[in-house]
Amino acid sequence: EALGANVEFMDAEHHDLVLAVTSHAPHLIAYTMVGVADDLGRVTDKEVINFSAAGFRDFTRIAASDPTMWRDVFLHNKEATLEILGRFTEELFDLQRAIRRGDGDQLFEYFDRTRAIRRSIIDAGQDTEAANFGRGSVDE
């Protein structure tokens, strides 16, 4: 607190789960997407650079993180990370199945629900321009 940090108290298991969903899994997803782009022989590096939009650029920014640190994070918090990755894999499989079946309603409902979540985060005061995203204490 003396350094301006917001201190939150939670038990270790809950902390690990929160960080797995908000930090660890997004890093693994970013590493994976950048790796897939690199491994996809039919897409050249020039095309990846020329056609990448903000989302992919964010993946490359995240994937540029320190590999030693992230290896250690994943191995230290493997239980929570594996739980979140399992849930992510299930959701991804459901979306894959909806695309395969041409189920536009399922896709729309999923995208609409997740868009509403993002909007509620913004409505709750997240400021994407602020260095700390406008976060105060969770209790505020």
Model-derived segments and their meaning:
Residues 116-140:
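Long, positively charged, glycine-interspersed low-complexity recognition regions
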Residues 1-61:
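Internal alpha-helical scaffold of NAD(P)-dependent oxidoreductase catalytic cores
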Residues 45-114:
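Interdomain hinge/lid region at the active-site interface
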Residues 33, 37-40, 96-103, 122-125, ...:
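Long, hydrophobic, amphipathic alpha-helical segments used as structural scaffolds
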Residues 8, 23, 27, 86, ...:
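Generic structural signal for well-ordered, non-transmembrane alpha-helical segments
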